[in-house]
Amino acid sequence: MTMTDPVADMLTRLRNANSAHHDTVSMPHSKLKVHIAEILTTEGYISGWEVADARVGQTLTLSLKFGPNRERSIAGIKRVSKPGLRVYAKSTELPKVLGGLGVAILSTSSGLLTDRQAEKKGVGGEVLAYVW
């Protein structure tokens, strides 16, 4: 069975593993998911990621990040643009997550960018997710 929304599946797996205090979470690999993992690592929400060969295809494994007393580094994660309702933002109307404390992940003509990177480059695009 094919997956309708692989990004939503990734975010849901990440949210569930985070709330269950798992150290890692695995999912099917795709280039888009790797780019999202790179953004989450750069922004400090996860500690790292790796791609491994599985019996069928490749698997992306994310290493979750916790504080000294096992506090979650990801307080919340939300899928914004969905297959049934796409959400786009102009470069002048980029969303701010929690007044700039969180990050919005956008798919732009320059690749996947955070809201801050898109603002610097002056590009808009599809708002994939909010992470805070």
Curated annotation (Swiss-Prot):
Transmembrane segments: none annotated. Keywords: Ribonucleoprotein, Ribosomal protein, RNA-binding, rRNA-binding. GO terms for cellular component: ribonucleoprotein complex; ribosome. Belongs to the universal ribosomal protein uS8 family. SUPFAM superfamilies: Ribosomal protein S8. Pfam families: Ribosomal_S8. The keyword Iron-sulfur does not apply. GO terms for biological process: translation. It comes from Leifsonia xyli subsp. xyli (strain CTCB07). One of the primary rRNA binding proteins, it binds directly to 16S rRNA central domain where it helps coordinate assembly of the platform of the 30S subunit. This is Small ribosomal subunit protein uS8. Part of the 30S ribosomal subunit. Contacts proteins S5 and S12. NCBIfam families: PRK00136.1 (NF001109). GO terms for molecular function: rRNA binding; structural constituent of ribosome. HAMAP family: Ribosomal_uS8_B.
